[in-house]
Amino acid sequence: MRKDICAIYAPFHPLTPKYSYKGIFMLLILHPNIQESDPAFKKTMSHLQQLSGVKIKQHEVSGQLQSLREIYLLGDTHALDIEEIESLPAVEKVIRISEEYRILGRHKTQGGRSGFHYQGLAFDQESLHIFAGLCAVDNPKHVEEMLRALQANGLNCTRMGAYKPRTNPYAFQGHGKDCLPWVFDLAGKYGIKVIAMEVTHESHMHEIDKALADAGRPCGVIMQIGTRNTQNFELLKAIGKQSEYPALLKRGFGITLNESLNAAEYLASEGNSQVIFCLRGMKSEFGAPHRNMVDFAQVPTVKRLTRMPVCIDPSHSVGSRDIAPDGVLELCHATAQGVLAGANMVLVDFHPAPTKALVDGPQALTLNELEPFLKDMEIARKAYLERVTVWQDA
């Protein structure tokens, strides 16, 4: 079975109204690297187009080693013979799908490693990437200091907020497109491969794409959808309709986990299955004194229900630099809990001068704390892998 993305079509759900076909869907996984011009593909499509009451939709994802193509049979597929469909020359495997999260979900008959590659990096449920950086871009000096520190510590990913939706209309809203040219130039200078950057409007995607093109595309961008926009369906559709940039979707702070996962499915149903799901805490008085109720215990839950890489955002979950009696920051304890549970990405705020930060300075770690933070997470990651080995051998 191939070791790459295997996309499965969208569920019939209030959040995904685009394809409201009822019944059990059928997924056809085609042989790797097959093209539309291949005789086997043409013969397969000719047969499928003769099926009654079935809609056909194709989806293609380019991995690092393989081009992956899948066909979805939508509608009443109960009467279709799996063995007959599987005998078609372009088909490698056939799967019936009836569960929720049909594109991003984890399905019983589906094997192999899933995920995607972007900018030469693997994003899946086995990897771990640290995205340390500025919650909000403030000035070139601080951005360069941050990126220099990342390079010195062997990191090639970061977070940089150019567009900042704020609860207070008078608070700093970010520099927007004006800062993109020098942010991307500095990213190229310091070997940054991927930047996680929040967008709040479709126009922001176009501004980012233009700025990257003007800079010679020195890095890539993951389009981050913040917790306030988890159910901004027009934004989800816009990001889902393009496949140039992966998406990172934060859990909605006032909705259920199921609703947030279906928002991710909304992205994938539009065609972009390169989605990372981010746990960032839930808005609740029971989380006090933390900023939000830390929800990193649900890292394995999301991995069980879906095939998405799972990110954690300890900065916006904990929201402070409070130190526990053992001398470790509570934020670092929370981060380690998520990594110990198998998190695949950490989105964490750092700043060269937190007291001068324009957004969320009180929760930002300092550059002097970057090295011990990374060592701490390395310990947690090794412990997670050892835990997995213990249970696999049990």
Indicate residue ranges for each PLM-predicted region.
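N-terminal small/glycine-rich loop or linker at the start of catalytic domains
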Residues: 116-135, 166, 304-320
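Active-site mouth loops of central-metabolism enzymes
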Residues: 128-143, 169-173, 196-198, 227, ...
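Glycine-rich, proline-tolerant flexible connector loops at the mouths of alpha/beta enzymes
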Residues: 159-177, 350-361
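N-terminal active-site wall of soluble small-molecule enzyme domains
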Residues: 165-220, 232-234
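Catalytic alpha/beta core domains of metabolic enzymes, predominantly
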Residues: 231-350
